[in-house]
Amino acid sequence: KLADCQIGKQEGTELFIVEGDSAGGSAKQGRNRANQAVLPLRGKILNTYVEEIVPKKNSNQNGSEHRTKALSKMISSNEIVTLINALGLDPKVEELDLKDLRYGKIIIMTDADVDGSHIRALLLTFFNNKPFNKLIENGHVYLAQPPLFKINKGTKGIYIKDEKALEEYIINNNKEVKKLKKGSKEYLKALDEEKSIMSIQRFKGLGEMNPEELWSTTLDPETRNLLQVQYSKDLKKDQKLIHTLMGNDVALRKDFIVSNAINVQNLDI
């Protein structure tokens, strides 16, 4: 259920989209109720990717028919319908009137692990579909950056975004590890040994963080990091990548994965 904010205008307000009631509970307690709303998504989010078509001459296909099918695919997900309603928008229109948008910032706040990344990708896929891509084009969609780790040092906690950031933290705070060649057996062994003697907590989800932690790391505008979702200058290239990853062509996606597997540094299985 949507926990709305007190301010009833678009300017200065934020909607946080979170996974489930556990994360939703912490977010609702930790937020600034004046301008921050929270929408927990409970059910499964579907892949709502819709391929844009350009009707060919002498073809039975037309834009209106394609739009109807696209809409049916999007609203087949109860969670997407809930989201559209929370935003104050109408899914049945060809063009969005952004004056109807209830919040200035739409912030996707999923868990920092691979499951959270998957849900984030599905939500971004929805926002890429017309007419909702207008929200991205006009700078309304953001990604929260919650921590995956907490390092306990005495009474203080140091929050770390992900595996890469944890590795960098260890390197910068250990001269012996820093001397070793990155990626070598000696380096990886020293890294694991250092991790084993540190007090590291891995958050399985945002629900494991208490409201104060969630506020200070992810919700507070003074201390948080937000990523604004933007298209690149080469929009066709963006859409080609989205089609490859989220479309129905399995062979195309497999080729992409095989071709880029060599570039993977941190694999979370």
Go through each PLM region and give its residues.
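Conserved phosphate-chemistry cores used by DNA topoisomerases
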Residues: K1-I269
